[in-house]
């Protein structure tokens, strides 16, 4: 099953997440099919907190991909901002 989920990057105590389309059997930070955005929970000042390609997310959902709980909330946030 294909899932749209967060893949952690960044340094220790400074998380930065890529929003990726991946096979659910792949490791969290492992192989992925496509990168559709990023999420920076510690963004300060005028740094961008969330960037998401909603067209690609919707295309993957139409193909049967499921969203993780956190990504689902981020998609709603991005749709509200757009």
Curated annotation (Swiss-Prot):
Q: Which BP terms does GO give this entry?
A: translation
| InterPro entries in the cross-refs | Ribosomal_bS16, Ribosomal_bS16_CS, Ribosomal_bS16_dom_sf
The signal peptide, as residue positions, is none
Record has Aminoacyl-tRNA synthetase as a keyword: no
Matching Pfam families: Ribosomal_S16
Name a single GO cellular component: small ribosomal subunit
Which GO MF terms does the UniProt record name? structural constituent of ribosome
The UniProt keywords, alphabetically, are: Ribonucleoprotein, Ribosomal protein
Do you know which HAMAP family this protein is assigned to?
Ribosomal_bS16
* Family to which this protein belongs: Belongs to the bacterial ribosomal protein bS16 family.
Q: What is this protein called?
A: Small ribosomal subunit protein bS16
Source species: Pasteurella multocida (strain Pm70)
């Amino acid at each position: 099953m294909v899932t749209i989920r967060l893949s952690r990057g960044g340094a220790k105590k400074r998380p930065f997440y890529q929003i990726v389309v991946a096979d659910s059997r792949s490791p969290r930070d492992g192989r992925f099919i496509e990168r559709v955005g990023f999420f920076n929970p510690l963004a300060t000042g005028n740094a961008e907190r969330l960037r998401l390609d909603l067209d690609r997310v919707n295309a993957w959902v139409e193909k049967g991909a499921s969203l993780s709980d956190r990504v689902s909330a981020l998609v709603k946030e991005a749709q509200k901002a757009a």
